[in-house]
A protein has these predicted regions:
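Conserved beta-ketoacyl condensing-enzyme motif
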Residues: 26-28, 66-130, 243-264, 270
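Claisen-condensing/thiolase-fold acyl-transfer catalytic domains that form or cleave C-C bonds
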Residues: 3-5, 73, 77-80, 103-104, ...
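Buried hydrophobic positions in well-ordered alpha/beta secondary-structure cores of metabolic enzymes
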Residues: 26-28, 54, 83, 97, ...
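Acidic-glycine-rich active-site phosphate/pyrophosphate-binding loop
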Residues: 47-56, 107-120, 156-163, 207-211, ...
């Protein structure tokens, strides 16, 4: 750990005062992935199966794994810096930094203040967002609310997790599922991808998906989680579409939490969508928890899949249980 140093506090930034409601949008994306990619072979050998068994059950062929000296904060900083560069935003102009994560390097401090300081956003409000795999959507709602209420002008939202460090290598249910990574988005008034509506939900289901302070690894009832994940994401999407007065046919691309291939396909089938209308990057990345939605957004942009005029529907499900959906609208689409 680097030696502590006493910093001169930056003067507090006066907060914008509330005025009439304005819309928030996304001005740029960024992502960061560890260099090491691990295929199914070593995991399969450890749990006594063939690599194809893992691929068939999960749709995952490989995942990124952080090095021993590579922390969550480093990935978040890299993704955040790339998003700020893509949005042409000076870090000193950022009003808030939110980091959605379940795997911060320390219990305290949270990751967000460290990320903000490293990026040069020293006057920004900063905090971590929980809700596991749903964390990025929760952060999207929080960041958009800050902008819409005129409490902030520029928000850096990062989803980052390194759950390979919290995985039991001998547990067939979870050993092959998780990967590490970070994705980020810069939120500003009237950005290209207008945010909203956002819906979030939850229910108490602790014993079927958790990391406790004793084992410190993910424990999961896979069948129970699968059923509820598909159902709750479908429910959240239908609720959002009703609020937005849209039909699923009005949506150009669906980005569901990249939990595994079976869950992504099940959500797709619930809505009768063709595969090319649903983002699926899980084969190469695995389940990156809070990073999965922003990573998929960044990759979809690079692949030319985000519409110039149209709608992108985001949905996620995580421990808690927690779930949600959010709509991004590009261009002047009504």
């Amino acid at each position: 750990m680097p030696a502590s140093r006493l910093l001169e506090p930056a003067p507090a930034r006066p907060l914008p005062q509330p005025s009439r409601r304005r819309t928030a949008g996304i001005a740029g994306f960024g992502r960061a992935l560890p260099a090491t990619s691990v295929d199914n072979a070593p995991i399969a050998a450890r749990i006594g199966v063939e690599p194809a068994w893992i691929t068939k059950r999960t749709g995952i062929s490989r995942r990124r794994r952080s090095a021993a000296d590579e922390g969550l904060t480093e990935l978040a900083i890299e993704a955040g810096a790339r998003a700020l560069a893509a949005a042409a935003v000076d870090p000193a102009d950022v009003d808030a930094v939110l980091v959605a994560t379940s795997s911060s390097d320390d219990v305290v401090p949270q990751a967000a203040p460290l990320v903000a300081g490293a990026l040069g956003a020293e006057r920004a409000m900063s905090w971590d967002v929980g809700l596991a795999c749903t964390g990025f959507l929760a952060g999207l709602q929080q960041g958009a609310a800050l902008i819409e209420s005129n409490r902030a002008t520029t928000v850096l939202l990062i989803g980052a997790d390194i759950l390979t460090r919290y995985t039991d290598a001998d547990d067939r249910q979870t050993a092959a599922l998780f990967g590490d990574g970070a994705g980020a988005a810069v939120l500003v008034p009237g950005g290209a991808g207008s945010i909203g509506p956002v819906v979030l939900g939850g229910e108490p289901q602790r014993d079927v998906l958790y990391i406790d302070r004793t084992d410190n690894v993910v424990r999961m009832d896979g069948k129970f989680v699968y059923t509820h994940a598909v159902d709750r994401m479908e429910r959240a999407c239908r609720e959002l579409l009703e609020i937005a007065e849209l039909a699923i046919d009005d949506v150009d691309l669906v980005i569901a939490h990249q939990a595994n291939g079976r869950i992504i396909n099940a959500v797709r089938e619930r809505f009768g969508l063709d595969p090319d209308r649903v983002a699926d990057y899980v084969a190469d990345l695995g389940n990156t928890s809070a990073a999965s939605v922003p990573l998929a957004l960044s990759l979809a942009q690079d692949d030319g899949r985000l519409p110039e005029q149209g709608h992108v529907l985001l949905t996620a499900f995580g421990a808690g249980f927690s779930w949600g959906a959010a709509l991004l609208t590009f261009g002047d689409t009504p």
